[in-house]
């Protein structure tokens, strides 16, 4: 099974090798599913991604 179903379902099974593209998941940790831009100071390590822009709506 593909460990990363983000592009199909909007959710991820966060396996150690999960690499998401076109991420729309709301349950994945940033380390698994990099929704937020790298270097985004508002996206703390371990946050749950909600968006692709570096602002307060990026992560919950």
From Swiss-Prot:
A divalent metal cation 4 binds at residues 32-33, 43, 47. The keyword Signal does not apply. Metallothioneins have a high content of cysteine residues that bind various heavy metals. This is Metallothionein. A divalent metal cation 6 binds at residues 36, 40, 43, 59. The lineage of its organism: Eukaryota, Metazoa, Chordata, Craniata, Vertebrata. A divalent metal cation 5 binds at residues 33, 35-36, 49. A divalent metal cation 2 binds at residues 6, 12, 14, 25. Gene3D superfamilies: Metallothionein Isoform II. Coiled coil: none annotated. The gene is mt. Belongs to the metallothionein superfamily. Type 1 family. Keywords: Metal-binding, Metal-thiolate cluster. It comes from Zoarces viviparus (Viviparous eelpout). It comes from the Eukaryota. Residues 29-60 are annotated as: Alpha.
